[in-house]
């Protein structure tokens, strides 16, 4: 049995440093790299792909809303056509640096509010998938396990990656608890490890109300901007290895 381990990275820009990419990238198997709209810039994009190449880490695009001030975590009122163009623009940016370094993208994962907004919104999910398909139909699409984006990807005949979150709590509907709520994040390492093990080994998640619901886990996400990220990644890998579960790029 194996599982992919991903993190959202490349989120520094200019003089502002976010996350600990240099320490995390050698440990994970897939990196979701900001493309300059919600975070990141041309230098950071270049450096992050260099790091991925050096450590054999799978490269993924992490396109978000054009909202540096809100870190892409605020909803923007955009038409489906605008979203499709937004995704295409960001895919072009990261692909240019992949070409520069002789690398290829493996997957695409929308960021933040854009990712969450696909839940129950088939039109938005289809706009994102169409942009990716028209850019490169071989790219995999990462979305919340069993969600609208995953279904839209599969309907297009593309490969979907069912993602679960090590550091986020879930609602009874299988969506992520809003960051506006105090219990959105999991801050304790042991709780995160138990959370991951239940999802990967048992294909279940315990929701915020204590209910167990079924889900599929293809890839585990740890948010790279969190202060606990590096410790979480190390603990998760150790626990999975002890369970005989191999961590590798999907």
Curated annotation (Swiss-Prot):
It catalyses: 5-oxo-L-proline + ATP + 2 H2O = L-glutamate + ADP + phosphate + H(+). GO terms for biological process: carbohydrate metabolic process. SUPFAM superfamilies: Glycoside hydrolase/deacetylase. Gene3D superfamilies: Glycoside hydrolase/deacetylase. CDD domains: LamB_YcsF_like. Keywords: ATP-binding, Hydrolase, Nucleotide-binding. Its EC number is 3.5.2.9. GO terms for molecular function: 5-oxoprolinase (ATP-hydrolyzing) activity; ATP binding. It comes from the Bacteria. InterPro entries: Glyco_hydro/deAcase_b/a-brl (IPR011330), LamB/YcsF/PxpA-like (IPR005501). It is an enzyme of class 3 (hydrolase). Forms a complex composed of PxpA, PxpB and PxpC. Belongs to the LamB/PxpA family. HAMAP family: PxpA. PANTHER family: 5-OXOPROLINASE SUBUNIT A, UNCHARACTERIZED PROTEIN YBGL-RELATED. NCBIfam families: PRK05406.1-3, PRK05406.1-5. This is 5-oxoprolinase subunit A. It comes from Macrococcus caseolyticus (strain JCSC5402) (Macrococcoides caseolyticum).
